[in-house]
Amino acid sequence: MIARSKKTTCWVVGTLVLAASVLLSAPVARAEQLAPWRDTAVPALSLTALDGATVDLTAQSGNLVIVHFFATWCEPCRDELKSLERLAAAQEAHPFRILAVDVGEPGDRVRRFLARNEISVRYPVLIDFDKQAMRAWGVEMLPTSYVLDRALCPLWKVAGALDWDVDPILSMIVHEITERAASTEGQKNCTVKGGMR
């Protein structure tokens, strides 16, 4: 009787954990879900990366920037991190940066996750252990990504997983990196909102 009760409890807990991960993980997004991000300024972002360095968003000025929020338990996040890695490799010679932000987990867990899933990233992976950045940026589901232009002004937001290195998304990114470079030349950076809540 006790064994059956324990089995039932484990099954219920497992089901609840699975349901929570499904609800909190956004479905795969399409190009039309890369919606204009209408804020006039972006929140502050300064976090410690897995290599121990402090990475500040303001230092990325002059680059098109993708700020990508994820977690190791988020199933769609795994493929999206690999997609972002392919995009980073393809655009390595251009003014383009990716900042991946893990939400609510210790660095060791993130390192194991990346190794286990053979995700070799050439962009900083930042740790938002207390979820302050997640709250400041208004992240409601994972994955969520924000695209900033080269003056660090809000450009696009997408809630849900996206395949970044295929068209039409790839063409949109390349256009912003190359064709619009002249239009942001000398443009004053958008004001970064005050500290993270």
Model-assigned labels for residue ranges:
Residues 63-65, 69-73, 141:
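Short pre-active-site segment immediately N-terminal to redox-active cysteine/selenocysteine motifs
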